[in-house]
UniProtKB/Swiss-Prot annotation:
Gene3D superfamilies: 1.10.150.130, Intergrase catalytic core. This is Tyrosine recombinase XerS. The gene is xerS. It comes from Streptococcus thermophilus (strain ATCC BAA-250 / LMG 18311). Residues 169-354 form the Tyr recombinase domain. Its main location: cytoplasm. InterPro entries: CB, DNA_brk_join_enz, Integrase-like_cat_sf, Integrase_catalytic, Integrase_recombinase_N, Integrase_SAM-like_N, Recomb_XerS, Tyrosine_recombinase_XerCD. NCBIfam families: PRK05084.1 (NF003462). The keyword Cell cycle applies. Residues 16-121 form the Core-binding (CB) domain. GO terms for molecular function: DNA binding; tyrosine-based site-specific recombinase activity. The lineage of its organism: Bacteria, Bacillati, Bacillota, Bacilli, Lactobacillales.
């Protein structure tokens, strides 16, 4: 979703919310949480508050009128009824024959509510310096995790990674082969953004940064001489991230045409630009997702920018066998998240089995 539309949607949801959610929003904006995260949380709160009214737990006429005491007095049984409602309600997707929402969606909803309750019961300071209330019903609600071992997840993800020489083959395909089957009209659009698209893909594959981190890069954040980019990680921390040298020519090519191609002026500080009717703007996450999906599907299999992050992490672990190094590259505080990559790179285990 484009940033302007995202901000419009956020304001629309904020206009519906009770005062304590608006306080929560302002607090998390200062952390800062991303606008995308806050938007998703507001959507979940709207769904939950509508249920409170429809089920008769709250006698408020609208969401904004819901009293904070309603949240304080919710029982474990109430929350379990809400989860049951999510599981059994008719699907909003008319193409799906399934009832209810997925477990992933339920977990996301409960996570959003847990964040709100933690704020209200632990983080906020009322006039007396104390939280608004202390009883946190969400601590009594457990989430159901998907039953899948790391090995099974790794095998599933492995099919969607560009490992070994496929990393360079993918870049070469976009640069030299993708255009062959395009119409003349499609070629015109492709040529306009070719250098930029290659630079973005190369940056993701060479650094493993998150999509949001790539989108928010400014010109001042990249140092091609040292092959380092400065990014803002989750939670707002600044971090310097190394890039593999294979990305340099793609980034240099893009930077050489950036100003003229996208009509960039001094005030246009974003690294990756898009241009519409002569006006340059920072490229948004949705555009990059669609771009990566388009090229990857034509090359081998449709993937997301996050799979390019997995690709870099797996290749780096394969080369170093160091989870610590990989976790630092990805910006993780612990190596637990990188356990996945030890299962993707499991040739030693397979070789041992072959020798039995």
């Amino acid at each position: 979703m484009k940033r302007e539309l995202l901000l419009e949607k956020i304001e629309e949801y904020k206009s519906l919310m009770p005062w304590f959610v608006l306080e929560y929003y302002q607090s998390k904006l200062s952390v800062p949480y991303s606008f995308t995260t806050l938007y998703e949380y507001l959507k979940e709160y709207k769904r939950f508050f509508n249920w409170l009214i429809d089920s008769g737990i709250s006698d408020a006429d609208d969401i904004a009128s819901i009293h904070i005491k309603t949240l304080e007095n919710l029982t474990k049984k109430d929350m379990e009824s809400f989860v049951l409602y999510l599981r059994e309600r008719p699907s909003l997707n008319t193409y799906s024959k399934k009832q209810g929402v997925s477990q992933t969606t339920i977990n996301r909803t409960l996570s959003a509510l847990s964040c709100l309750y933690k704020y209200l019961t632990e983080e906020v300071e009322g006039p007396d310096g104390e939280p608004y209330f202390y009883r946190n019903v969400m601590k009594k609600i457990s989430t159901k995790k998907k039953k899948e071992t790391l090995a099974a997840r790794a095998e599933n993800i492995k099919q969607k990674l560009f490992l070994g020489d496929e990393t360079m083959k993918f870049l070469d395909y976009v640069e030299n082969e993708y255009e062959v089957k395009l119409s003349n009209r499609a070629k015109s659009s492709f040529y306009k953004n070719k250098e930029r698209d290659l630079a973005i893909i190369a940056l993701l594959l060479s650094s493993g940064v998150r999509l949001s981190e790539a989108v928010n890069l400014d010109l001042k954040d990249i140092n091609l001489k040292r092959m380092v980019i400065d990014v803002t990680r989750k939670g707002g921390q600044r971090d310097s991230v190394n890039m593999a040298s294979f990305a340099r020519p793609y980034l240099e090519n893009y930077l050489s045409i950036r100003n003229k191609r996208y009509k960039a002026e001094k005030q246009d500080v974003a690294l990756f630009l898009t241009e519409y009717r002569g006006v340059p703007n920072r490229i948004d996450a949705s555009s990059i997702e669609k771009m990566v999906a388009k090229y990857s599907q034509d090359f081998k299999i449709r993937v997301t920018p996050h799979k390019l992050r997995h690709t870099l992490a797996t290749r780096l672990y394969d080369a170093t066998k160091s989870q610590v190094l990989v976790s630092h590259q990805l910006g993780h505080a612990s190596t637990q998240v990188t356990d996945l990559y030890t299962h993707i790179v499991n040739d030693e285990q397979k070789n041992a089995l072959d020798n039995l």
